[in-house]
UniProtKB/Swiss-Prot annotation:
Catalyzes the attachment of glutamate to tRNA(Glu) in a two-step reaction: glutamate is first activated by ATP to form Glu-AMP and then transferred to the acceptor end of tRNA(Glu). It holds the Pfam family Anticodon_2. This is Glutamate--tRNA ligase. ATP binds at K258.
């Protein structure tokens, strides 16, 4: 590429890092790293009403957890928060006012609301009507004096070129254009409190920080013509724009909503549940982009190498919680035991299960886990007297030969000495029950598994029985025999 790549992720510190914002950050990160460019973070905190205490720290902490790093940010550079750049915004506000490209607007919220209501009743498209329309210079001066005498604080509006055409070649969606007359009239670039509006400040920031490419969600498409107006008014070259498609819920087919309880939507949720960051990073990278081929598991380094902005999807990206869980399970299975055990320790400790067998339990159930917090429900059988059964499990235990199998296997366990009770000796005892009773296959193994573990599926049965212990295994079988004899 001919020009230096400089991209940014510019969150508002209004709460936790959402999966959609994480995707925006991640695609900018991959784009910069792939092209040897600069990835920076800027905090857009001009909306003081939505500001959340500690929101900035939370955003950066969760980005780091995902595995991203950056070259410039408020941590290392001055004036990378919009609230620290008010003088710069004012400089360009004053310039536009002096050049007649912007003006002070004294219309009140009540007047704006009344005009919107009139337009709605008349079936007109809502838009701001210039309050100075038809006024002479003397009338305009008198109007301003009257408003200021009444204590009305003005906003500043950009004078829109109604006949202008604002177009760009979008990196994702191709050619897009808007007519200046369809923007809604002259729009506010500075609020009454002196803070700039988003669409003004973002242009000043992107130009000042020499941003070359703006990659963001397609909910920002409608903002782009307004931003192009500011670039035009100030005589600046605009960056390239790319608008990623929406993320939809794979089950409903609708835009992902915070009300969708079947999905975890905040990065903090994944951290707390014990997902591996590499898995979440991998999953998010494939939301609206793919490198081609059948593979879906990629390291961060592989994703950086493979990233190609030309493969960003034009179709909505489906957020599939089941796919993420499958991917997470793959990462956990292939992670080293020490890593997963360290992640499991807080969960085990809180549940009072950080015993001398804890690491063995993690090793036993690691292949089943989608998130590390699942170590608690998976190991319930080791810390309870009688496991809760599902309807399917209860149905298995109504089989005619179940009592025979359980009585025979209980007798085998009771006959074993402590020295004999080791993993490799347990399977032969099950086979001995088969030989004695003539019962085999599922009719043999399933009742033993359910009686001991309360599960129809799980780790190797001898491993489970050994970790559970001889006495507790016998106790579980006795409890099950009592239950099925009722």
């Amino acid at each position: 590429m001919s020009k230096d790549i400089r991209v940014r992720y510019a969150p508002s510190p209004t709460g936790l890092l959402h999966i959609g914002n994480a995707r925006t950050a991640l695609f900018n990160y991959l784009y910069a790293r792939h092209h040897g460019g600069t990835f920076l973070i800027r905090i857009e905190d001009t909306d003081r009403k939505r500001h959340v205490e500690d929101g900035e720290r939370s955003q950066l902490e969760n980005l780091r957890w995902l595995g991203m790093d950056w070259d410039e940010s408020p941590e290392s550079h001055e004036n990378y928060r919009q609230s620290e750049r008010l003088d710069l915004y004012q400089k360009y506000i004053d310039q536009l006012l002096a050049e007649g490209k912007a003006y002070k607007s004294y219309v009140t919220e009540e007047e704006l609301a009344a005009e919107r209501e009139r337009q709605e009743v008349a079936g007109e498209t809502p838009r701001y009507i210039n309050e100075y329309l038809g006024m002479s210079e003397e009338e305009k001066a008198a109007y301003i004096a009257e408003r200021e005498a009444a204590g009305i604080i003005p906003t500043v509006r950009l004078a829109v070129n109604e006949s202008g055409i604002y177009k760009w070649h979008d990196m994702v969606k191709g050619d897009i254009e808007f007519e200046g007359g369809n923007i809604g009239g002259d729009w506010v670039i500075q609020k009454k409190d002196g803070y700039p509006t988003y669409n003004f400040a973002v242009v000043i920031d992107d130009h000042d920080m020499q941003i070359s490419h703006v990659i963001r969600g397609d909910d920002h498409i409608a903002n782009t013509p307004k931003q192009l107006m500011v670039y035009e008014a100030l005589g600046w070259e605009a960056p390239e724009f790319g608008h990623m498609t929406l993320i939809i819920n794979s089950e409903t087919g609708k835009k992902l909503s915070k009300r969708d309880t079947n999905t975890l939507q905040f990065i903090e949720d994944y951290r707390k549940k014990g997902y591996l960051p590499e898995a979440v990073f991998n999953f998010i990278a494939l939301l609206g982009w793919n490198p081609g081929g059948e593979d879906e598991i990629f390291s961060r380094e592989e994703l950086i190498k493979l990233f190609d902005e030309n493969r960003l999807s034009k179709s909505p990206a489906a957020f599939d919680q089941k796919k993420l869980d499958w991917m997470s399970n793959d990462y956990i299975k292939n992670a080293d035991l020490e890593t997963i055990f360290e992640m499991a320790k807080p969960f085990l400790e809180e549940a009072g299960r950080l015993t001398d067998k804890a690491e063995k339990l993690v090793e036993l159930y690691k292949p089943q886990m989608k998130s590390v917090d699942e170590i608690i429900p998976l190991t319930d059988l080791f810390f309870s007297d009688f496991p809760e059964l599902t309807e399917a499990e209860r149905e298995v235990m109504t089989g005619e030969t179940v009592p025979t199998v359980l009585e025979a296997f209980k007798a085998k366990l009771e006959a074993m000495t402590d020295d004999e009770f080791v993993t490799e000796n347990i399977f032969p005892q099950i086979k001995a029950v088969q030989k004695e009773t003539g019962i085999k296959g599922k009719n043999l193994f399933m009742p033993i598994r359910i009686a001991v573990s309360g599960e129809m599926h799980g780790p190797e049965l001898p491993d489970t029985i050994f970790l559970l212990g001889r006495e507790k295994s016998i106790q579980h079988i006795e409890n099950m025999l009592k239950e099925i004899s009722k």
